[in-house]
């Protein structure tokens, strides 16, 4: 199997990605960054996962935001 050391999504499930984004941004800020109803109205991991698994464009936006967050965290680690 090919190693993907530079891919922050490799080996991550959408549930883990979502939980990390919620921990980093919080639901309110996440709802502003990605304007999806399940992030803004009574947000929960369960309802968000159901929506993301059925809606490819939304899942792509969540993955892109995760990569952005990951790169910011790596930049901070590299400056310290």
Per-segment meaning from a language model:
Residues 1-80:
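Long, compositionally biased intrinsically disordered regulatory segments in eukaryotic proteins
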């Amino acid at each position: 199997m090919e190693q993907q050391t530079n891919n922050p999504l490799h080996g991550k499930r959408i549930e883990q990605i979502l939980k990390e984004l919620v921990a980093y941004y919080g639901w309110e800020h996440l709802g502003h960054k990605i304007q999806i109803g399940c992030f803004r109205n009574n947000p929960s991991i369960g309802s968000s996962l159901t929506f993301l698994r059925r809606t490819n464009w939304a899942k792509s936006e969540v993955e892109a935001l995760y990569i952005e967050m990951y790169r910011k965290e790596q930049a901070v680690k590299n400056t310290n």
